[in-house]
Swiss-Prot record:
It comes from Acyrthosiphon pisum. Substrate binds at residues 140-141, 174. The lineage of its organism: Eukaryota, Metazoa, Ecdysozoa, Arthropoda, Hexapoda. Keywords: Amino-acid biosynthesis, Cytoplasm, Hydrolase, Magnesium, Metal-binding, Methionine biosynthesis, Nucleus. It is an enzyme of class 3 (hydrolase). One of its GO terms (cellular component) is cytoplasm. This is Enolase-phosphatase E1.
């Protein structure tokens, strides 16, 4: 069988969904509806939990250059909006931001305004790997809920049943080898039994340092490869190549 490992761990953005879907559809959607969303859900328990995380993150970020504080009182809503936009502009991957984004996307998916993009090779290959007895997981900087919504409301319908579990940065940063050890412990396997697919070299390197195997994906619109760094990994253009005998 071409894939020896029993566990397939998938990055999402740039691996099984396009970077352009995230950058040109999901992120702009948050920016577009953020003010209305906060106004609509401000008093909801779910948003208040998001707000608590945002305030805690603001304390951590208070010494960061350009930091936008979250205030109380009459300007509270505006300050939250400005803080979220600041985090997004600076491509911060905080749990607080990702959780709020996930809830906003959920609203968009449920209303039919969003549909999760998947490359056309993804579902056929993952279904075959599942038939082979492989266990499929994801690991993304997006929250586990955001991942679930993408698959539940995908352009192909609800395909969330393929994935046994979703992991996010609560396991640790994707560029840290400890994160992959944490995931292995969480699903009770050895790192050597995990094949991690990603389009980011530092993530692939971290996974390998942890003892996992890693394959590098080259998709349209992904960042240019660094030949020196990427040469250490098997490089594929579609998941179909996982089913080929080398």
């Amino acid at each position: 069988m071409p894939v020896n490992e029993n566990v397939i761990l998938l990055d999402i953005e740039g691996t099984i969904t396009s970077i352009s879907f995230v950058k040109d559809t999901l992120f702009p959607y948050v920016t577009k509806v953020l003010e209305d969303y906060i106004e609509k859900y401000w008093d909801d328990e779910s948003f208040q939990q998001d707000l608590e995380l945002l305030r805690a993150q603001a304390v951590i970020d208070s010494n960061v250059e350009g930091f936008v504080p979250i205030s109380t009182g009459d300007n509270a809503k505006t300050s939250v909006i400005n803080n979220v936009l600041w985090q997004m502009t600076n491509d911060k991957k905080t749990t607080a931001l990702k959780q709020l984004q996930g809830h906003i996307w959920k609203d968009g998916y449920e209303s039919g305004l969003l549909r999760g993009h998947l490359y056309e090779d993804v579902l056929p290959v993952l279904n075959k790997l599942t038939d082979f007895g492989k266990k499929i997981y994801t690991y993304s900087s997006g929250s586990t809920k955001a991942q679930e919504y993408l698959f539940q409301y995908s352009m192909y319908g609800d395909v969330s049943g393929i994935f046994l579990k979703y992991f996010d940065t609560k396991m640790g940063p994707k560029g840290s080898e400890t994160s992959y050890i944490n995931i292995a412990n969480e699903i009770n396997v050895n790192c050597s039994d995990i094949l991690f697919l990603t389009d980011v070299v530092v993530e692939a390197e971290a996974a390998v340092k942890a003892g996992c195997n890693s394959i590098f994906l080259v998709r349209p619109g992904n960042a240019p490869l660094d030949p020196e760094k990427s040469s250490k990994f098997r490089i594929i253009k579609t998941l179909d190549e996982l089913l080929e005998t080398e």
